[in-house]
Amino acid sequence: MDLESFLLGAVYYYGLFIGLSNFEFDWNTGRVFTKKWSTLYAIALDSCIFALYIYHWTGNTNIVNAIFGRANMLHEYVVAILTGLRIVTGLFTLILRWYQRCKMMDLASKVVRMYVARPQVRRMSRWGILTKFIFGSITDGLQMAMVLSAMGSVDSQFYLGLGLQYWMFVILNMAMMQQHMIMLFVRTQFQLINTELRQVIDEAKDLLLSPRHQGVFMTKCCSLADQIENIARIQSQLQTIMNQMEEVFGIQGAMTYGGYYLSSVGTCYLAYSILKHGYENLSMTLSTVILAYSWCFFYYLDGMLNLSVMLHVQDDYWEMLQILGKRTIFVGLDVRLEEAFENLNLQLIRNPLKITVVKLYDVTRSNTMAMFGNLITHSIFLIQYDIEHF
């Protein structure tokens, strides 16, 4: 077993273990199916999570003061909003996985079958899989260390809440990892068909310059046309996968990236509070501060990985359009080959690739930079409010 197969298997079984995945598939055949034991296990575990949250919320516990000791009201609001959003997003993700189970199975079937049909994708995406796995594992590990550290400074009545918060974080992290893996496979497929498209164009150039023997020329043109039609078919499948991802992961993605945004603002404010008051005055230890900063670094680095792969998919799509633009130099080729080039070009123009969040926000570099600008502005506003009122 190679490294990427081992890592993908670990992600697959971990998703089943934590109750996020509620169906199974075979990496070797591409078959997606359900089993009684995995379905019952997911139902039991997810039901247990909801029941424990209901039980926990009936209690009256202020974990912010328990951890920070001298937290002011603004600290409590910031931490409560961030924690509450993470919990709601995690629970909503579990509900969506059951509500959209058939759609998820259909999406997984398309992705796994393309993965099986083109094994070179696995090799090309090796470093992307490894990088995401390492950063995700480190983030999970640091989150667990923070929970264990917090348990050492609070009463046992808070243990359940801390454990449930960690479980929600693990579920969200795994959900984003699954989405990232699909996007990574899509990007690798685009890179592969771009390489194939360049090869076809180079062969067409050579065909124009070589002496034309009618039988050989027609056979070669038909072969190139078949390759172009195969590229168009794969691109259409990738477009379908992207559209299905928007439908399946749209709401979850909006809540998750909204959480990243609010968490970034809150983290900037809490970092300012530590510098202003000192971690001792917030009843924090140096090890807790180091853990928190380390977790933030890998958490946001992991988020940047998720963002970068989406931007790179769009770059590969536009690169495909640029490569295809070179077809205008082909004059006098076989009619079928010319039509294959033209049909592929029309297919790309009529149905352009766009990555949106619930059709409200386009994921582009310009919008991303604008979002970072707003993040800095809102962080400054929150710090100014603290200066004026606390």
UniProtKB/Swiss-Prot annotation:
The chain crosses the membrane at residues 5-25, 37-57, 76-96, 133-153, 166-186, 255-275, 289-309. The keyword Transmembrane applies. Expressed in neurons of the terminal external chemosensory organ of larvae. GO terms for molecular function: ligand-gated monoatomic ion channel activity; taste receptor activity. Residues 1-4, 58-75, 154-165, 276-288 are cytoplasmic. It is a multi-pass membrane protein. GO terms for biological process: monoatomic ion transmembrane transport; sensory perception of taste; signal transduction. This is Putative gustatory receptor 36c. It comes from Drosophila melanogaster.
